[in-house]
Amino acid sequence: FAEDGWQPPSSLQFIAVGGALVSEMLILKARSLNLPVYQGYGLSEAASVVSLNAPTNDNIHSAGSVLPHIQTKIENGQLFIKGDLFLGYLNHQPHDKDQWYATGDLVEQRQNTLFIKGRLKNLIITSMGRNISAEWPESLLLSQSGILQAVVFGEGRPFLSAIIYADTKLSNPVLAQYINVINQQLPDYARIQKWHRLAAPLSVQQGLLTTNNRPKRDAISKQYHAVFEQFYRLGEVINE
């Protein structure tokens, strides 16, 4: 709506974004439209904010400063937290408040600031031995106007490929230009070499998204197995 001329009310002072890695480009674009967007990081088990940027303490590359009631440590790239957390999961043993909780998120911490890299389970290890968080190139793809869904693959493969759903108004040549722009921001090993454009979006009904619209990567990989095999056999860009 903001791109179409809608102006936010002057009373709107702060918009917190999170739930997935948000690219710097997307935040800058939102702010250029007078949307006061600040990235944070949290999880339900922490009820729920762990770190947050603010107008007086803002690092656009990061998920902000850790809040005072949370303790953090990093082990093998994974963030562990301790503090005022949840009591536990239903029908499971209570959570020990003195025990560190493994978040499953890959994070860098510099002083008191968190830099989110992605989910541990979404780490791609290529056949060249490169470790790449899928959310890294995905967040850049999704920062481009008209790219509505993007899921990156490449586990055990020599390069990365992507499944993309884009606005029907976006032509293939323009989409290719967008991907080229994104690739210039990535090192060679993390660039999208091949991509497949979907005719219809991934959906919960197809079993390809969770109920909160996160990609079910294994299901997507199986659904488009033939596409990926053709990518790595022939190196062609395919459109449905």
Q: Which residues make up each language-model segment?
A:
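Conserved ANL (AMP-binding/adenylate-forming) active-site segment centered on the GW(Y/F)…HTG consensus within
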Residues: 10, 58-60, 84-111, 121, ...
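AMP-binding/adenylate-forming catalytic core of the ANL superfamily
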Residues: 83, 106-190, 194, 201
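Ser/Thr-glycine-rich phosphate-binding loops at phosphate-binding pockets of nucleotides
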Residues: 43-46, 102-103, 126-127, 210-212
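Gly/Ser/Thr-rich phosphate-binding loop
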Residues: 1-58, 148
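Conserved C-terminal "lid"/linker of ANL adenylate-forming enzymes
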Residues: 124, 146-152, 181-240
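Conserved ATP/PPi-binding loop(s) of AMP-dependent carboxylate-activating enzymes
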Residues: 36, 65-68, 75-100, 113-114, ...
